[in-house]
């Protein structure tokens, strides 16, 4: 454990690990493989690739790893990739003054405090903590710890346990699997998921405080797609680098898989009643991608339509069921149809 702590300290808590950088490089390579025509056209037309970040060190390092791999894969892009531009209102909105109500919710909302306290107080928490402590320490030492101390230790251990795979390059050979029994690790993972769900995910039924602030990012996705369709942007592509605090609420607004069900006050979030899982909603290098395509030409004199395809964590993903794709089972949608079903204007 000390080796892992030392590695995390040397890296800097919250900074991008070697594994994280490689995840971004791999994602960039796969993007080029999926859309070779896009990058060929960008290079041929000398169109810029815009790069935007939250300004946080981790996001900037992610951008550099990603764009470095893009250029390595296609040297013709050299000179076309812009330097990272910081946009905190768009990509770090949870910390901005306009969302003070969200931070007040985290700090002191009575419903939030009550539901998390009730989940933490489930008997399984004390049981898992006690089991963890008694497996690792002498009986007399374990008996001298209060229940709260056992829980604090076990949950701190789980944080290290869950971080270890991301630090395998910085702390090679460190394996914390023997320190936590799988059922106990699963329970502590659930406690973390419950906290994320109520702080950044669908949250309480009838309340939008955890995700309404992501509207600015959804609006910008539409604005960029509309500009591409209208031919009013010089950018060949726009790459953004942000955080789970932004991806998770955006996933709710987009109705992405696992992010569609808030929890009624009378039936708190649990694995048995809700599909939301942090490892699926926002894994390392989580991403949302919109591809805009010029559609087939219409009748003479009619404008060419544009289609949008969404990828979520690099998988083609349907928009909400209120949006109608170009054909049954397709992942392509007319841009005008998306504008209609997201309430951005009447369908043409």
Please annotate each region the language model reported.
Residues 1-50, 54-238, 242-348:
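Signature for phosphate-centric chemistry
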């Amino acid at each position: 454990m000390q080796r892992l702590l030392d590695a995390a300290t040397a890296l800097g808590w919250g900074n991008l690990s070697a594994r994280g950088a490689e995840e971004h490089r791999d994602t960039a390579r796969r993007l080029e493989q999926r859309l070779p025509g896009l990058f060929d056209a960008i290079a041929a037309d000398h169109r810029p690739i815009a790069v935007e970040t939250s300004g946080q060190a981790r996001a900037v390092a992610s951008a550099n790893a990603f764009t470095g791999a893009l250029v390595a894969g296609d040297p013709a892009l050299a000179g076309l990739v812009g330097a990272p531009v910081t946009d905190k209102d768009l990509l770090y909105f949870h910390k901005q003054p306009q969302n003070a109500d969200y931070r007040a919710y985290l700090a002191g909302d009575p419903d939030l405090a009550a539901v998390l306290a009730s989940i933490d107080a489930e008997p399984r928490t004390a049981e898992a903590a006690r089991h963890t402590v008694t497996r690792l320490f002498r009986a007399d030492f374990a008996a001298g710890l209060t229940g709260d101390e056992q829980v604090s230790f076990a949950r701190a251990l789980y944080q290290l346990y869950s971080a270890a795979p991301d630090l395998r390059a910085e702390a090679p050979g460190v394996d914390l699997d023997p320190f936590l029994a799988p059922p106990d690790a699963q329970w502590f993972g659930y406690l973390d998921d419950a906290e994320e769900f109520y702080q950044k995910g669908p949250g309480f039924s009838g309340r939008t405080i955890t995700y309404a602030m992501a509207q600015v990012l959804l609006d910008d996705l539409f604005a960029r797609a509309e500009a591409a369709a209208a031919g009013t942007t010089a950018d060949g592509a726009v790459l953004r680098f942000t955080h789970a605090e932004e991806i998770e609420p955006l996933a709710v607004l987009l109705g992405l898989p696992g992010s569609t069900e808030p929890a009624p006050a009378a039936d708190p979030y649990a694995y048995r009643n809700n599909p939301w899982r942090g490892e699926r909603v926002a894994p390392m290098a989580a991403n949302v991608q919109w591809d805009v395509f010029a559609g087939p030409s219409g009748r003479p004199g009619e404008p060419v339509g544009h289609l949008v395809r969404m990828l979520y964590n690099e998988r083609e993903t349907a928009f909400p069921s209120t949006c109608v794709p170009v054909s049954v089972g397709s992942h392509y949608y007319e841009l005008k149809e998306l504008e209609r079903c997201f309430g951005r204007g009447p369908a043409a």
